[in-house]
Each structure stands twice: as structure tokens, then as C-alpha cells.
Design a protein with these regions (language model features):
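Exposed boundary/loop context
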Residues: 14-15, 123
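Bacterial Sec-dependent N-terminal signal peptides
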Residues: 3, 16-41
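First exposed extracellular module after export/assembly in secreted or surface-exposed proteins
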Residues: 30-209
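Bacterial N-terminal signal peptides that target proteins for export
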Residues: 1-11
Length: 209
């Protein structure tokens, strides 16, 4: 083999490694879990009134701390609320890509889904205790992805009437848990909380005074 042939083969091998490297890096970046340092929940009364805003934060990002609630959820009884979630990464500048995580989740809706769980019977709608233990259980989602599957950035909740005769034994305090799953290529009509990576898992205290 002459010198020219050797150089030609070496160039071909180097080019193959370069192309292979480019093709394998990008999907990994696309499927990386989201970095979330602050979550804001806004409960807006459907029939008008002052929104209830609570938040959770994780100032060290990928460090040892987890997202922790800063507030307790306190909702009026017998009231319908629209809940919206805002997720941000405060380790990035507001103008940088990767700051507004809720927008990324919306854009990649076919890869993400929020699951909700709560103390049984705190809400008249949805009923039950949420879909963390079973995907088939009821949550009222008001947003969908491109395949018409729920995302969960927007939901609707109606609290029980604590003064009604039929609910006098129902607890008015409990917990409200939100889990965000990252399910690229896995999300479907039955994929539950055990499928995919967990981007977020927070449990708030909740009270109906």
C-alpha cells in the first residue's frame, strides 16, 4: 500500500468517527432531564377572586438539596380553581435558553406529563386521591400534547364543601403532591408514574379552613 492510500484510509476512519460522534451526542442532550430550581403554583378561582400563589425552590440546582415547599396551600372550601404551573431554572439568566422550563415542557409535551396525588376526598372534582398510584384515576387536565394526551401544566380543581352534612368526617387538611415525568418515546395513553425519568417530585401541605 503506498503513502497516498494510507492517508486516504486514515482520513476515512477519522471522518467516520466524527460523523458517529455528532449523531450520538444530540439525542442525549434532547432526552436530558430538566433542571428546575423554582416551581410556582397559581390557583385562580374560576368565578373570580384573588389567586392563591404558592411556591417551592431548590437553590443549589443539581446539588444535594431537593425542591422544597416554601408555602402551604390554603384553599377555600366549595370553590373551583384553575391551577397553572410555572417552572424555571434560576441558574440560567432569564434571557438564556433553559430558563423557562415550563415553556420547554409545553413544547416537548409529547415527552412530559404531570401526575397528581392528594389526601383522599379533599376535592369534589376530581374525585379520589389522584393518578400517582394509578394512571387511570381521575385528574382534570385542561392542556394536551400533539397526540391529545394530557400534559398537566394546566388543571382544574373543585374543593369539597366542608360545611355540608355528607362531608362532616372528611379531613380538611392533608397533602398535595406533584410529579413531573420525562418520557421521551415512552409516553402513551397508559404510561404511569413509574415510566421514564423524574424531573420533579414535590409534596405540599394543603388546608381547607
Amino acid at each position: 500500500m503506498n503513502y497516498t492510500q494510507i492517508l486516504s484510509r486514515l482520513f476515512s476512519v477519522a471522518l467516520a468517527f466524527f460523523v458517529f460522534g455528532c449523531n450520538t451526542d444530540d439525542p442525549k442532550k434532547e432526552d436530558a432531564p430538566e433542571l428546575i430550581t423554582k416551581v410556582t403554583l397559581t390557583f385562580t378561582p374560576v368565578n373570580g377572586g384573588t389567586p392563591i400563589v404558592v411556591s417551592a425552590s431548590d437553590p443549589d440546582g443539581e446539588g444535594v438539596q431537593d425542591l422544597a415547599p416554601e408555602d402551604e396551600i390554603v384553599l377555600a372550601d366549595g370553590t373551583a380553581y384553575d391551577l397553572s404551573l410555572e417552572l424555571i431554572n434560576e441558574l440560567a439568566a432569564p434571557t438564556e435558553e433553559g430558563y423557562d422550563i415550563s415553556e420547554e415542557v409545553k413544547e416537548e409535551g409529547d415527552e412530559h406529563m404531570f401526575f397528581y396525588g392528594w389526601t383522599n376526598d379533599l376535592f369534589s372534582s376530581p374525585t379520589g386521591n389522584g393518578n400517582i398510584d394509578s394512571r387511570a384515576d381521575q385528574v382534570i387536565y385542561t392542556d394536551n400534547d400533539s397526540k391529545n394526551l394530557p400534559i398537566g401544566l394546566l388543571t382544574r380543581w373543585t374543593t369539597i364543601d366542608t360545611g355540608s352534612a355528607h362531608s362532616h368526617t372528611t379531613p380538611t387538611t392533608g397533602t398535595f403532591r406533584i410529579v413531573l415525568k420525562h418520557q421521551p418515546g415512552l409516553k402513551n395513553g397508559t404510561s404511569g408514574v413509574n415510566i421514564g425519568e423524574t424531573d420533579m417530585d414535590i409534596t405540599f401541605s394543603i388546608t381547607l379552613p
